[in-house]
Amino acid sequence: INGDAKGIVFFEQETSEAPVKVTGEVLGLAKGLHGFHVHEFGDNTNGCMSSGPHYNPRNKEHGAPTDENRHLGDLGNIQAAGDSPTAVSITDSKITLFGADSIIGRTVVVHADA
């Protein structure tokens, strides 16, 4: 995507045991599926190169959002129409906004061509 995409995404979690609701929209995506992931570092000064790998504090394998064995940062794909904002609407029970495994302060990366 080369940094051409931009948008706003909200993460909401009522309690530490509740799922996280991810909502928002991304502009500038080409038509098709795009990976949507939380990366390890909150540094995006050099695009996704400085954000590190997918957030994976438990050393799991890369997987789909519904897989038991997956990186915490693996949130699946978003579908872009190519000519309008791309809606983000994800509910995830593995990521958290609380405690040692919190995603707060990390970078969200949208990958081209998932």
Curated annotation (Swiss-Prot):
Transmembrane segments: none annotated. Cu cation binds at H37, H39, H54, H111. Residues 49-73 are annotated as: Disordered. One of its GO terms (cellular component) is cytoplasm. The keyword Nucleotide-binding does not apply. Pfam families: Sod_Cu. Residues 58-73 have a biased composition (Basic and acidic residues). It comes from the Eukaryota. PANTHER family: SUPEROXIDE DISMUTASE CU-ZN -RELATED (PTHR10003). Homodimer. Belongs to the Cu-Zn superoxide dismutase family. This is Superoxide dismutase [Cu-Zn]. It comes from Drosophila madeirensis (Fruit fly).
